[in-house]
Amino acid sequence: DKNDQKLNNIDYIFKQKESNDFSIIQVYTQLFELAEIEYEIAISCNRFYLKFDPDLFDPNQLREFLIYLPKSNIYISPNRIEYRATEAPDDLLGNYAMYIDKNLDYYFSEIILENKNFSKINKEILVNLPKNLKKAVINENRKFTGYWGILNRNYVYLSENEKTDFLIDYFTISGLDDKKVLKYQINNYDIDYNFRNQPLRINTKLITRDLVKKVDGKTILNVGKVIGLQSNLFNEDERINPIEINFPNEYYYDIKFMIPKGYKIANIHDLTKEKKFISVDGNVTAQFKSSANFEKNRLSIKISEFYNSLKYEKNRYDEFRDVINAAAEFYNLEIELSKN
């Protein structure tokens, strides 16, 4: 209760270990002053619900408090237990905020992501195909950092335990009609691991019949399915708003298929793709790139996909869409296996 006067007493807060959204700011600021650490209070709002307009100021925009440490360009979110001294929460990125220093001087500035490489998904996938090509065994190691780690740890934190049916399905390859999970191991899932951006690690093993099919006597391997379902963008209507993603992020896949001896691949060149978005300053700010090679019955595929900007120009929507859809197109890729 923000009207409870006891919660404005610093001694009471430390003794009872109880505070509210406002008094916890008092705790932090007094500790920073004692330690002679420079700080500012930043007040903003969720960008998905309200755009903070610094030119047409409205007090209703002052909805969420952050503590900004200017010397290190990091934020503390005192009312969100999943955040530590790190980047600002993703739903505040790109919004403006009112920054207030200890002398009560203020200014307006955009909340910026300091580390563009903060959020990554790394997947190592090993697929073993038996001689009869029926049941594929897939071993996968995943690592999530940044906002991906924070988001997925929240799912675990809000679940009954770290091994619910929902989590096991969520953290294994999506889009497989036939999937049996043989092993599921999750590490670093406590929210304390968000400190220093330590990766959330998930190791799984599953079997599926969904990767190989026969079509007109040909053996078809659904290579793309191992990356899981991907987003699509369509342009049926004229775009009105600028393009804004959840947060800058990166994906890396290291995929290996162990093919039974005696088989060759007819169309490996189909697995090489590249789509990119080049900003006006000449930098590549979004890209999907895949490459593949086949040697000694091992098909190796490497994929990198990244989005380094939070916002993209709406008049270049088609270029942005091509990058997004490249991953969806890869998911649908099939190659033909034929005997030597």
Indicate where each model-derived feature is located.
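A sensor for short, sequence-defined functional sites
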Residues: 1-340
